[in-house]
Amino acid sequence: MGDPRKPRKKWSPPGHPWVKERLIEEMKLMGEYGLRNKREIWIAAAMLRRYRHRARELLALPAEVREKEEKALLKRLYDLGLVDENATLDDVLSLTVRDLLERRLQTVVYKKGLAKSIYHARQLVTHGHIAINGRRVTSPGYIVRRDEEELIGYAPTSPYFKKAQQ
């Protein structure tokens, strides 16, 4: 059976806590994307850091070795909707936290017009009114894949679903 793995943090706080420019930028992101706390920004930054680190590792490899892994990384990022179909590793290195926050379920629900505000979108998601392909998703930080984008709608058991049907 084995021992269960120890759950680890998916984020790391900034190195210095009181850098004014970073604090201002984080507050702007929190307001623009309706985030509850800065940890949500740090989680997105950590995820992005992992992708960018992988891209830098691949750039250091010889061309014939990196080709297969480069395609896999670019396909993964394309499926997440972070890069275009004909993207390069330089495009991966130029990704920002803002690009990743645009792919959160909360943001996509607001951009699709299912919610009146970004905060309303968060409430709809957490209260179980939003479903992807008929399956209820209650995490506003869920990263929406490219193929799931058009499948987002109200959950069948939601009162909003009944209003939308009329």
From Swiss-Prot:
The keyword rRNA-binding applies. Keywords: Ribonucleoprotein, Ribosomal protein, RNA-binding, rRNA-binding. The gene is rps4. It comes from the Archaea. Pfam families: Ribosomal_S4, S4. SMART domains: Ribosomal_S4, S4. Residues 103-165 form the S4 RNA-binding domain. One of its GO terms (cellular component) is small ribosomal subunit. Belongs to the universal ribosomal protein uS4 family. InterPro entries: Ribosomal_uS4, Ribosomal_uS4_arc, Ribosomal_uS4_CS, Ribosomal_uS4_euk/arc, Ribosomal_uS4_N, S4_RNA-bd, S4_RNA-bd_sf. Gene3D superfamilies: RNA-binding S4 domain. Part of the 30S ribosomal subunit. Contacts protein S5. The interaction surface between S4 and S5 is involved in control of translational fidelity. One of the primary rRNA binding proteins, it binds directly to 16S rRNA where it nucleates assembly of the body of the 30S subunit. One of its GO terms (molecular function) is rRNA binding. This is Small ribosomal subunit protein uS4. GO terms for biological process: ribosomal small subunit biogenesis; translation.
